[in-house]
Amino acid sequence: MATQRRDESPSGLSDIVEPDGLLGIGLTSRHIEAFGRKVTSTAGHLMGPITDSSNGSHYHTAMADIHRELRRPTTQRKVFSLTQTSPTDLVRSKLSTSEIQSRALSSVPDELLANIPEDSSSYSLFEGFKATQDDHEFRKAHRRRSSKGKKLLKDGEAAGALPSAPTDLKKERDLLSRRLDLMGVRKNMCSSEIHEIDNKIANLHNIRKIVLDRLAGLEMEEAELEHQLTEIDNKLEDIQEEAPKTPLTAATPKSSSVNDDSVVSEDAALDASFMSESIYQKLPSHSPRSLKQRSIRKRSMPILHEHFAPGSQIKEMQAHTDMVTAIDFDYPFGTMVSAALDDTVRVWDLNTGRCTGFLEGHNASVRCLQVEDNIVATGSMDASVKLWDLSRARTVTRDNRLNKPSEGEGEDDNASDAFSLFSATTLEDCYVFSLDAHVDEVTALHFRGNTLISGSADKTLRQWDLVKGRCVQTLDVLWAAAQASTLAADTQWRPSGRLPDASADFVGALQCFDAALACGTADGMVRLWDLRSGQVHRSLVGHTGPITCLQFDEVHLVTGSQDRSIRIWDLRMGSIFDAYAYDKPITSMMFDTKRIVAAAGENVVKVYDKADGHHWDCGAGVGADESGPAPATVERVRLKDGYLLEGRKDGTVAAWTC
C-alpha cells in the first residue's frame, strides 16, 4: 500500500505525500521538515552571540522581563501549585459539555451534509422549536394589553368604543399572525406524530399476529405431545396390570373336575360381588380393556383464546344436519360432545375441529348432556340416561351417511363432500351403563362426584348413586297433577320461539352441589331442595314463564325463562339481585366469573358484562350482510373461561372468544 511503504531515495525521506497525513492530522513529512528549518533559524537568530551585530537586544530584553516576572510572589505560588498538579489535570479540558458538543458540530464534512435527506415539512426546525414553547407568557401579556383602557361603567353610562392607536393595533395584528402561524406548525407536528403512532401500531399488530401464530403452533404441538404421553401411560398401565397374572396362572397345578367346578363357582360369586361394587365394571362382555377408570389431565390449559379480541371467531363446524339440542365441553380447545335432532351424539376435538367419533346407544334424540373430564352423561327422549367413559374409547371406522344415494344414481362432487363430512369413527367400549327408571323423556340432568340428578317429563326428579348404579331417591313434585291442566289450558306459557306447537318441558333445568339441588320447572318457579331430607327448602317466585335454564355459584343463582327475562337471585337473602330482559324467550344460558351469555331466539349470542352492566352481541349475526343469507338462530350456548360455544338451528357449532 502507498500509505505503508517508502520509496528508496538518496535523502532517506519519502517523496510520496501520504493522502491521510501523519497522525491523522493532515501533516506530511515535507511540512515537518519546513517547520524544523524555521525553528532552527529562529532559535539561532535569538540566541546568537552578543557580538553579532545582526542580532538585536530582543532576546535579552525578553529574558530580563521573564526574570523579573518570576521573582514576584504571585507568580512563584502559581509555579509551585503547578508542580503539585497531576499530569491528568494538566491535560484535562476546561470546556463544558455543551461547548464541546458545539465545537464538534460546528465543523461537519461535506460528505455528511450531502447525505441529509430532504425534508418535506412545510416549516423549519427553528419554527418547530418555537412552536413547542409554551405561550403562557403571551397569554398573560395579551390579557394585560387587552385590559388597558377599560374602566368600570357607572349606572346610566353608555359603553362607547374606546379608540386605540394604529401602532398598537398593528403590533397586535402581527403578534396574532405569528401565533396563527405557530398554530399551523403545531397542527402539522401533531399530524406527523399521529401518522408515526399509526405506523407503530400497525407494526405492533403485525408482530402480535406473528406471535399469536407461533403460540397456536406451540399449543398444537403441546396437545400432540400430551396425547402421545397419555398413550404411553396407558400402555404402561396395561403392562403392569397383566404382568402379575402370567406367572400365577402358569404355576397353578391342575386339579380335579370337582375342584374346578368349585373354583369356577367361587370365581363367579366373587365376580358378581365385585361387579356390583362399581358402575365402571359394567362394560360390554367383549371388551378386553382394563376396568380401571382412567382420567386424562392436562398439564397446562390453552391460553390462545385469551389473547383474541372479545367477539372473535375461533372456529366453526358443521356438526349436524338438524337443530342442535345440547352441547358441552370440558375445557377450552378440549373435547366437545354435541347432540341434535338428527339422532346422533358426536365427539369433537376443538383443537382441530374434527369429529373423533359417535356415541351410539340411544333410541331417540338426546335432549341434555354433560361433560366432566372424560365422563359424559346423556339424557334422551327414550327415557334413559347413559354414561360414557371417553378414556376407554376404541375407534372403529364407520360410515354414517344420511340419505345415501342409490347405486344407480350418480354422485356429484358436492354430494360426495356432504356425505364424507359425517364419515367418522364409532367410539366402542365407551359405554359404561344405563339408568332406565324414568317413564318419559329426560329433559335435564346434572352430575357431580358420585351423584347424578335427572329430571323427566314424567314430573319426577331422580337421584342416582354412580358407584352402585341405581336410583336412591325419587322426588315427586306434589303440585304436578294440579299444574298439568293449567299448563294445557294456559296459552301464555306455550313457547313462542324454539318449539311453537309443543308445550314447555316440565323440568326445564337443574343443578346439584352436595346435598343442595336447584330445579326450575314449567310453572316459572325455582325450588331449592335438600337431598338429605327430600324436601323443598326454599322457592323463588318471580318468573311468569317456564324456566329453561339455570346455574348457581356460592352467592348467586341465575335463571332464564320463556318470559324473555334473566334474573339473578341472591341465595343468602332469597331475593332478586338483578334482572334484565330481551325481545324473545331465553332458550339457553350460562355464566362465568365475568359474563353471562344467553341464547334468546336470535342469530347472535347475548352477552352481559357483570362488572359494568354492558350488553353486547357475539356471533355470526354481528355485522352480517343483509343481502346475503342470514345465520341460523342460536339454540344452545356454553361458556368456560372466556371460551364460548354456540349451537344453531341448522346444526352449526361455532367457537368464539368472550
Curated annotation (Swiss-Prot):
PROSITE patterns: WD_REPEATS_1, WD_REPEATS_2, WD_REPEATS_REGION. It is a peripheral membrane protein. Keywords: Coiled coil, Membrane, Mitochondrion, Mitochondrion outer membrane, Repeat, WD repeat. Residues 139-170 are annotated as: Disordered. One of its GO terms (cellular component) is mitochondrial outer membrane. Its main location: mitochondrion. Belongs to the WD repeat MDV1/CAF4 family. Involved in mitochondrial fission. Acts as an adapter protein required to form mitochondrial fission complexes. Formation of these complexes is required to promote constriction and fission of the mitochondrial compartment at a late step in mitochondrial division. This is Mitochondrial division protein 1. It comes from Aspergillus fumigatus (strain ATCC MYA-4609 / CBS 101355 / FGSC A1100 / Af293). The gene is mdv1.
